[in-house]
């Protein structure tokens, strides 16, 4: 058995001459199917109908390809022997063709056509019996009109198996089985193919032309070579056809019946049934495609490309070995094809590529093929081919590697696939960096599969195919990270409805360049700048940092600053700011893990600075807890750093700044001066003073001696007490950390003075802490120290405390000692006092004196009362009432004076932090004074204070940590407080308790950690607000404390989202809303921030009531920090918008449009979303553009080819109306791929404005959504989710008739349900004006829309909101239908109860 020789680059000339002789001379003019295709076809096939003829031509061409390949390989002697035999066979064929044609015509009338394949001569030596048995191959295929076939090709180019009839499949399978029956038989068949090709000159010519792609025929040898290439490319398909042809030839020669052939074929089928059936289907589909286009050669070019594409990888893997065993491998490939349809195709391509000359010629031909169609078409075709490879056999796992080269059209398809494969990941990078490359490199398989159809489109572009491709293109974006850039391609292809896909090319480039390049390229500098910013932040001045922090907090407020959820709405730089805001918040939460994604923002530098600061804060917060020593030192040393960290450690910075203030504090009082001098010495360690005081107490082994000294001091003079008290007031006011700690400790003393044992207990704890000396230990173990002091020491301390109760001087000492201790004990006991005031404490308080009892009551009152201001006032009054004395009065007055007249230095230095400290310190001072009065202060007080001062001179890190922890918990522990006691929170009492808890501090470490978290998530602007407001409050002492405390407390409550989530029921209007408000107050001035800052001030403090109880919330607008928001007229503006939207209600206009459908509109909107992202426009621009399109289409008829022009022009008008810097007309011409002229755009603009009568100030859903968000204080993520839901409706035509205000309300309502924030629903109902029952039907529809959004082919909005910049809200699963129904039913029931 002779094996086939390796393919030769050239074939003997005699073959072609002989084959040309075989072809009969009577051919119909319809035989020429291609533009340049001058092939000769056997008469039997010519007699068929044009469609069947083309199908026959396809099959024959495929068979001939195989024969061509086989011709060059058999040994020369056989070729010559076959030539004679071929002549005889050809004569027989010519004789029988007419009769056969008539019979076939009759069958065509029944829509059945039998394809007579040109006889294939098999070598007599191998399969003699086959040749002798006559068989008329009747490949029955349902003849379809070219139109239907075109549609099928466009829609299901790959589903070729469905079309061929059973006979077709069986025949082909039989032919294949003949080939595969045995290796030697296959060889013989291949050898037969040579004479077959020699016989049919027309076949050779036909094959040559598809390979040459309409180029002039080269020499016959070259043509034969190309045929071999095509043969290898179409190995499976052609082999099947070859076998069929061979069998048909033998049948015709022997004139046997079909049955005999079937029997033999059945015997042959044993191996390759499935293998060949698949290629058979493909062949039939190919035939149909050829019939559709009438350009067989042109059509075959794409198949070649497909094979080359598929084979690119395989060719790389096995470049040479298969050249020699090409024919053998063909059979093997067919056999393997059964297992791997895809592999067979790939191997074919491999074989093609493996023949070097074949690869070269193939590449050249493919290039020529590309050159002929426009480059745009070429791009489409390669993609289509890959799609075919991918979808037909699912073998196109190759990725559109070849597509890139195909698009270039001048580079070999085979050579670049490697590079493409090598860097699939880089394609994403290049995708963002080089949109043009993206266009060329549609890496996603979906794109490839979609583009497969365009091959037909290139030949006969129709409107349907562009749409199909557009849909397919939408799928491609799934893989790539920067979907928006890829989607431009999708949009453009979708707009291919105009009949040309090419116009989509530039929009892609434009969008990708503007959108992803900027996003991806800039991230690196962004990160670098973050680092530099972190370094620079420390050097920046405190004040400058504070404002930045304010802005940053405003921008960052993710959950707390619910109103910053509209960063995208910033009209100045909406997209950049949006991304920046969202990124910063995300980066804070994620700790910059998503920096790569954050890089999408072009202008995140400022935000990143802020974010970096926050990161540093967060990082420092953790060490602060763990190792507060270094952190605190650094903070005290570098107030600027404190302010940088002020977001996370605002209290800490305040305490430090207070220290600085204390250093610069006025010397109004000698005692305060001394304190200041002490502070100046230990400015960095103000907290350590208290600790040192404790240390001194501890060091003075004889605490009794200190007590004696206190007694002696008491004996010395009461005047000293007065002066001391006055100084204490001033000191407390000025001592930011000391006063705070003293106050807190004294508060604890008030609660602990009753149980002095605890006081001494704390002292020993302090001693333990002091012995430890390390701040970390202090921070981590203060609780442990409190919990683990030895029992003996506790007993002795308790006894001493009893003695102290008997001797007030001792009490004073204990009080003084405790302040330091209290800083630690303060954390635990205050909670215990608030939560579980021990009876022991009560008894103790009662026993020592009425003052202690009053003091205890005051502490309780503080917890119960709404604000520290009232608490302080109450304390003052109670203290004065209990023990009216000039000393007390003077003390309070002095404290008030100090508060009223803080030194200018203090004001300037600590305007913001001072306010906090002043308010807290003043309260503490008042409280301490009250305590002292209650305790009957004596000179012992003076001594006790003086001693702490001495201690302050040698501060320790412990005090610093204590002060910082104390201050920080006061400001930031509120979320925990609210969570700990949700029921106790009332409109005011909640705030008061929060403050008292903040002072007394629950577990400080936990609070600090939570505060850090909250700061990282969204540094509370409420704190900043509290800083700013206290200044004005300080000027008016009476109101100062009230307003300051309110503002201060409100931020505490609202800064952390935990409060609301943990205690929604207990949250009253004031506390909940106020907190939300404070978060948003210091927002940027952009519109989105303006509306998001809707939570600037708490709503009027009504009881927890339902919306019915809520009076119109003027507070929402009256204190807006954004002057552009026009808070004075916010209500009137909102009412006007609702009235005006009635004038722009849309009706069902699509029925009046002749050429445009709702699907086309959806494609256009999807494209406009991409344009908005690419140009970085605001959301308002997008919404308005869509609204303009709808209004225009409602009043005028638009043609399909002008739809994109309409969309681009409407977007241009909207940009002029909404944007500060709108794109130029040329930019819009460019994104349309220059399909329209500048004059056309301007003309369309005039037309739109005339139709709309220039009335384009149209209320949109986004405006209402902003307003609702401002009113109900949603957090950033919830607001972004509602925006996503609302934007999804833009593509859906059936939402066009909904009112914008109602659509916005329903979107926000669904977002609240999804985020489990149902307790805000009554507020939404109140402010929107829509009842919940009105919104429920729309909510159901929106939930369905979200449920199936991931399955929608138009994914521009989905990908946009899947980005981390938008919190990836698109990935939040929609509510289950049953669960949603339960929620809606509960709401309805609740509403019924309220009514």
Curated annotation (Swiss-Prot):
GO cellular component labels: cyclin-dependent protein kinase holoenzyme complex; cytoplasm; nucleoplasm; nucleus
Residue window of motif D-box: 60-68
Tissue note: Testis specific. In testis, it is expressed in developing germ cells, but not in Leydig cells. Weakly or not expressed in other tissues.
Highest taxon, organism lineage: Eukaryota
Alphabetically ordered keywords of this record: Cell cycle, Cell division, Cyclin, Meiosis, Nucleus, Ubl conjugation
PANTHER family: CYCLINS
UniProt protein name: G2/mitotic-specific cyclin-B3
């Amino acid at each position: 058995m002779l094996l086939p020789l390796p393919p030769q680059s050239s074939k003997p000339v005699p073959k072609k001459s002989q084959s040309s002789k075989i072809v009969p001379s009577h051919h119909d003019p319809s035989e020429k199917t291609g533009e340049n295709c001058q092939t000769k076809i056997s008469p039997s096939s010519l007699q068929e109908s044009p469609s069947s003829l083309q199908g026959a031509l396809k099959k024959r061409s495929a068979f001939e390809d195989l024969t061509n390949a086989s011709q060059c390989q058999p040994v020369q002697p056989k070729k010559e022997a076959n030539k004679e035999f071929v002549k005889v066979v050809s004569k027989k064929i010519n004789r029988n063709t007419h009769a056969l044609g008539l019979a076939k015509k009759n069958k065509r009338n029944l829509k059945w056509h039998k394809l007579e394949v040109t006889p294939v001569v098999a070598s007599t030596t191998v399969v003699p019996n086959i040749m002798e048995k006559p068989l008329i191959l009747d490949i029955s295929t349902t003849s379809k009109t070219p139109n239907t076939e075109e549609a099928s090709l466009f829609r299901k180019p790959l589903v070729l198996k469905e079309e061929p009839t059973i006979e077709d499949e069986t025949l082909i399978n039989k032919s294949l089985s003949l080939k595969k029956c045995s290796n030697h038989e296959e060889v013989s068949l291949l050898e037969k193919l040579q004479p077959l090709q020699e016989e049919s000159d027309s076949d050779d010519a036909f094959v040559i032309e598809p390979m040459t792609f309409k180029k002039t025929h080269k020499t016959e040898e070259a043509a034969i070579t190309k045929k071999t290439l095509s043969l290898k490319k179409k190995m499976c398909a052609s082999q099947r056809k070859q076998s069929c042809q061979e069998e048909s030839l033998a049948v015709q020669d022997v004139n046997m019946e079909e049955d005999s052939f079937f029997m033999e074929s059945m015997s042959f089928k044993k191996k390759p049934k499935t293998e060949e059936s698949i290629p058979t289907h493909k062949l039939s589909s190919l035939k149909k495609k050829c019939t559709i286009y009438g350009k067989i050669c042109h059509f075959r070019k794409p198949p070649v490309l497909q094979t080359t594409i598929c084979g690119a990888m395989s060719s790389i893997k096995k470049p040479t070995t298969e050249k020699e065993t090409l024919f053998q491998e063909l059979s093997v490939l067919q056999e393997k094809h059964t297992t791997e349809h895809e592999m067979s195709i790939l191997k074919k391509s491999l074989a093609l590529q493996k023949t070097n000359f074949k690869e070269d010629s193939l590449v050249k031909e493919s290039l020529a093929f590309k050159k002929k169609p426009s480059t745009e078409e070429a791009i489409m075709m390669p993609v289509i081919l890959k799609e075919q490879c991918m979808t037909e056999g699912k073998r196109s796992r190759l990725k559109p590697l070849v597509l890139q080269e195909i698009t270039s059209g001048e580079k070999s398809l085979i050579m670049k696939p490697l590079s493409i494969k090598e860097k699939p990941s880089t394609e994403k990078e290049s995708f963002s960096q080089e949109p043009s490359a993206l266009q060329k490199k549609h890496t996603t398989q979906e794109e490839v599969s979609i583009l497969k159809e365009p091959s037909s489109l290139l030949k006969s572009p129709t409107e349907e195919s562009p749409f199909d491709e557009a849909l397919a293109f939408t799928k491609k974006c799934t893989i790539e990270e920067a979907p928006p850039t890829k989607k431009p391609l999708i949009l453009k292809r979708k707009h291919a409805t105009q009949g040309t896909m090419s116009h989509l090319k530039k929009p892609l480039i434009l969008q990708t360049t503007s959108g992803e390049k900027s996003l991806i390229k800039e991230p690196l500098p962004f990160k670098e700048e973050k680092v530099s910013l972190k370094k620079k932040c420390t050097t920046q001045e405190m004040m400058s940092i504070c404002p930045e922090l304010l802005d940053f907090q405003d921008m960052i407020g993710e959950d707390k600053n619910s109103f910053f959820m509209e960063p995208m709405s910033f009209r100045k730089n909406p997209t950049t700011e949006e991304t920046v805001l969202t990124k910063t918040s995300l980066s804070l939460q994620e700790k910059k893990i998503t920096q790569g994604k954050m890089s999408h923002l072009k202008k995140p530098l400022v935000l990143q600075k802020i974010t970096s600061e926050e990161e540093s804060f967060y990082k420092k917060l953790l060490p602060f807890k763990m190792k507060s020593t270094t952190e605190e030192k650094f903070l005290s040393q570098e107030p600027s750093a404190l302010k940088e960290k002020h977001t996370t450690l605002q209290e800490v910075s305040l305490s430090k700044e207070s220290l600085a203030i204390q250093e610069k504090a006025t010397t109004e009082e000698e005692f305060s001066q001394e304190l200041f001098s002490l502070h100046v010495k230990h400015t960095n360690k103000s907290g350590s003073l208290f600790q040192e005081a404790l240390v001194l107490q501890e060091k003075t082994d004889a605490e009794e001696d200190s007590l004696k000294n206190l007694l002696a001091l008491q004996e010395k003079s009461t005047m000293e007490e007065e002066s001391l008290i006055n100084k204490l007031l001033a000191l407390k006011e000025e001592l930011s950390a000391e006063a705070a700690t003293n106050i807190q400790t004294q508060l604890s003393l008030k609660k602990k003075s009753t149980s002095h044992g605890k006081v001494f207990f704390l002292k020993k704890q302090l001693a333990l802490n002091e012995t430890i000396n390390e701040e970390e230990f202090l921070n981590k173990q203060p609780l442990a120290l409190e919990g683990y002091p030895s029992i003996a020491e506790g007993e002795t301390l308790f006894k001493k405390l009893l003695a102290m109760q008997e001797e007030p001087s001792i009490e004073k000492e204990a009080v003084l000692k405790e302040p330091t201790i209290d800083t630690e004990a303060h954390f635990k006991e205050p909670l215990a006092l608030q939560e579980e005031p021990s009876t022991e404490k009560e008894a103790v308080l009662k026993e020592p004196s009425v003052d202690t009892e009053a003091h205890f009551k005051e502490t309780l009152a503080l917890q119960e009362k709404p604000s520290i201001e009232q608490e302080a006032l109450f304390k003052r009054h109670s203290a004065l009432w209990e023990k009216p004395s000039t000393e007390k009065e003077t003390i309070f007055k002095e404290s008030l004076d100090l508060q009223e007249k803080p030194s200018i230095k203090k004001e300037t230095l600590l305007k913001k932090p001072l306010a906090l400290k002043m308010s807290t310190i003043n309260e503490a001072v008042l409280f301490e004074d009250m305590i002292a009065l209650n305790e009957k202060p004596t000179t012992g007080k003076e001594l006790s204070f003086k001693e702490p001062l001495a201690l302050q001179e040698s501060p320790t890190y412990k005090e610093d940590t204590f002060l910082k922890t104390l201050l920080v918990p006061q400001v930031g522990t509120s979320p925990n407080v609210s969570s700990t006691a949700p029921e106790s929170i009332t409109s005011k009492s909640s705030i008061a308790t929060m403050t008292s808890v903040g002072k007394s501090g629950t577990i400080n470490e936990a609070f600090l950690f939570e505060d850090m978290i909250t700061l990282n998530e969204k540094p509370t602007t409420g704190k900043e607000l509290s800083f700013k407001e206290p200044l004005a409050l300080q000027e008016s002492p009476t109101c100062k404390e009230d307003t300051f405390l309110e503002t201060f407390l409100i931020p505490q409550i609202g800064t952390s989202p935990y409060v609301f989530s943990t205690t929604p029921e207990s949250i009253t209007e004031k506390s909940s809303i106020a907190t939300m408000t404070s978060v948003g107050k210091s927002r940027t001035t952009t519109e989105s921030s303006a509306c998001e800052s809707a939570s600037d001030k708490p709503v009027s403090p009504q009881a927890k009531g339902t919306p019915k109880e809520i009076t119109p919330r003027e507070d929402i607008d009256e204190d807006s920090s954004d002057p552009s928001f026009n808070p004075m007229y916010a209500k009137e503006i909102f009412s006007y918008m609702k009235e005006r939207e009635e004038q722009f209600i849309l009706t069902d206009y699509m029925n009046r449009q002749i050429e445009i459908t709702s699907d086309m509109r959806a494609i256009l909107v999807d494209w406009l979303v991409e344009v908005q992202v690419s140009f970085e426009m605001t959301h308002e621009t997008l919404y308005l553009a869509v609204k303009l399109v709808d209004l225009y289409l409602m009043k005028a008829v638009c043609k399909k080819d002008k739809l994109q022009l309409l969309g681009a022009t409407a977007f241009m008008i909207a940009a002029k109306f909404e944007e500060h810097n709108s794109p130029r007309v040329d930019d819009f011409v460019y994104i349309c791929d220059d399909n329209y002229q500048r004059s056309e755009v301007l003309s369309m603009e005039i037309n739109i404005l005339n139709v709309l009568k220039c009335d384009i100030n149209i209320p949109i859903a986004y405006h209402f959504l902003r307003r609702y968000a401002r009113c109900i204080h949603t957090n950033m993520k919830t607001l972004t989710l509602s925006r996503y839901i609302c934007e999804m409706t833009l593509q859906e035509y059936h939402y066009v008739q909904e009112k914008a205000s109602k659509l916005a309300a329903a979107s926000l309502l669904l977002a609240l349900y999804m985020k489990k924030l149902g307790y805000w629903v009554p507020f939404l109902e109140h402010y929107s004006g829509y009842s919940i029952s009105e919104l429920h039907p729309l909510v159901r529809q929106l939930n369905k829309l979200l449920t199936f959004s991931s399955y929608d082919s138009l994914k521009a909005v989905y990908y946009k909101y899947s980005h981390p910049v938008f919190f990836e809200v698109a990935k939040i699963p929609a509510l289950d239908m049953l669960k949603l129904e339960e929620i809606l039913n509960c709401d309805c029931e609740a509403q019924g109860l309220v009514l």
